[in-house]
Design a protein with these regions (language model features):
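Active-site helix-to-loop segments that bind/position phosphate- or nucleotide-bearing substrates
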Residues: 1-27, 32-35, 43, 95-309
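Internal mixed beta-strand/loop scaffold within catalytic domains of large alpha/beta enzymes
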Residues: 23, 30-56, 60-62, 70, ...
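A surface-exposed, charged beta-strand/loop segment in the N-terminal or early-internal portion
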Residues: 48-127
């Protein structure tokens, strides 16, 4: 199906069909079936996009990459089953004054910012549990207070670790019958809930990277600098993990959107289920809510950009 102007409300698209190429044609971005006989599959106005996510055997034409750089469009690369591989961040997104201020942060200011993020993460974890009818979480409230009174980043990481352990020990209580969660596992995730959590954290990280395009993504305030790791995006994402990522996963399974039989033996989503996931994730990011501080309606996607500012 070819797209029309009204098919999307936001600025992010997902290309999952294997054997396709993303091209540019007369001020529009075109997804073309190069291995089959589908021809033009979709088309979007260039000026309305700022992020394109591609999965597996999807490639970009050289003229399109130049166009993406000119228009400030971020390109994120994933394997076919959603494992993040890398990103192209255009030079146009760099603003010298913003980065100069970022580089000038001293250790005390960095700690204050990091502590605020982790306190927000713990508060949001408690909020999610409360919304799902899970109570007896005063220990999280206490840890949230402790997070704002630490003296070092190592102390803050210790508080975060304690809060995470307490929070995940109660997450199972938010799930409907037929789903269980014992502990957080990664690389590889050992069950279906952990698989969905890992996938959602990757998708959310790339949303945050788009919001932080004017900054140096590799210079964070909490996560240690490591070659190739977008530490600043991981920092900003922390506060949103429970209330956006974990809430999205519980919604998927509790509403029956995703079921156990849609996973492969290695706990990855099947191709059809993955397409469903991408669509639901984008819908979720476009949903609006009343911002707790600004008190006006904003989409989840735009809330990242406000937080980045």
């Amino acid at each position: 199906m070819k797209s029309t102007e009204g098919m999307f409300d936001e600025s992010v698209i997902y290309v999952t069909k294997q054997g396709t190429q993303v091209r540019t044609d007369g001020g529009r971005i075109v997804v073309w079936d190069v291995e089959g006989d589908g021809g033009e599959l979709a088309t979007f106005p260039t000026e309305k996009l700022d992020t394109i996510n591609v999965f597996g055997g999807v490639n970009f034409s050289t003229p399109f990459v130049a166009e993406a750089n000119e228009h400030g469009i971020i390109l994120n690369y994933f394997t076919q089953n959603g494992k993040y591989r890398g990103s192209f961040v255009p030079e146009k997104n760099t603003i010298a004054e913003v980065r100069r201020a970022q580089y000038a942060l001293d250790e005390t200011t960095e700690l204050d910012i990091a502590a605020s993020m982790i306190a927000g993460k713990i508060r949001n974890a408690r909020t999610l549990l409360s919304r799902k009818g899970v109570y007896g979480t005063d220990v999280l409230k206490d840890l949230g207070v402790r997070a704002t009174n630490v003296e070092t980043k190592d102390d803050l990481r210790g508080v975060e670790g304690q809060a995470g352990e307490r929070y995940f020990s109660r997450l199972d209580e938010t799930l409907t019958d037929g789903w269980t969660f014992e502990k957080r596992t990664k690389r590889p995730p050992e069950d279906h809930i952990n698989s969905l959590l890992s996938l959602t954290y990757v998708f959310m990280k790339n949303e945050v990277m788009s919001a932080l395009r004017q900054y140096n993504l590799f210079l964070g305030v909490l996560h240690a600098d490591r070659h190739g790791r977008p530490s600043l995006a991981l920092d900003l994402q922390e506060e949103f993990r429970p209330i956006f990522c974990d809430a999205f996963v519980t919604r998927l399974v509790n509403r029956g959107v995703i079921d156990h039989d849609q996973f492969t033996q290695d706990n990855h989503l099947s191709d059809d289920a993955f397409k469903t996931y991408c669509g639901k994730f984008d819908d979720f990011m476009q949903e609006e809510f009343t911002h707790p501080y600004f008190e006006y309606t904003v989409s989840r996607r735009k809330s990242f950009r406000q937080q980045a500012i």
